[in-house]
Amino acid sequence: PDIVPVFMSGYSDKEYLKAAIKLKAVNYIEKPLNPVEIRDAIMEARDLCLEKKRTRQNASIHSMESASRLALLLTQPFAHAKESIDQLIAELSLSISNTTPFTAIVLKTDTEEELPLSEANAMFLSVREFLKTFHIDCIFAEKRVQYMVYFLFGSTPGAAVRKSIEEFFCNLYSRCTRFCIAAGDTVTGISRAYQSY
């Protein structure tokens, strides 16, 4: 977790100081306690926590953008973008091999307006969370405003799992707009993901 320790000790003990250093404490305050020193240490700890949170959020946004670029690349034949695809897979640390099953799901919405980014991201994250129960991961891209393209990969979904996934997508998108949904055949390997699309 993102914590920033501040040590306050009633003893001038070298072992406490070593422990504080090992735990990367922001400050080590000894008796007699000085309220100004405590306040400054807490403010510094707060600032460090906020910075860690911002860094984590920026990394998450960058990761989602990279995953979206990968999904867009998979909507074209593999040979056209092999190097970029390989680079993005490595950057995202995805466990994809030439035997990984891929299934494309395309939703065509009945809107001319782009979904707000926060809403599209929230929907993607809820899809991803839902799929975890089936040991399936996904990447997502919005294409030409009306098309939501998901590439599911990981375990091969059986008929019951496909039905559950289909129902989940229908429930998720029915709250927003009218839409059509289509799922491609499950194919083996990222080089064939385009064929599912």
Residue ranges: model-predicted function:
Residues 2-3, 168:
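A broadly used, surface-exposed interaction patch
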Residues 3, 138, 176-179:
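A structural micro-motif
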Residues 3-4, 26-28:
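Conserved phosphoryl-transfer motifs of two-component systems
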Residues 13-16:
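Alpha4-beta5-alpha5 switch/output surface of CheY-like receiver
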Residues 21, 25-27, 33-164, 183-195:
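Interdomain helical linkers/hinges and coiled-coil/dimerization scaffolds
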Residues 160-176:
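Alpha-helical scaffold within the catalytic cores of cyclic-nucleotide enzymes
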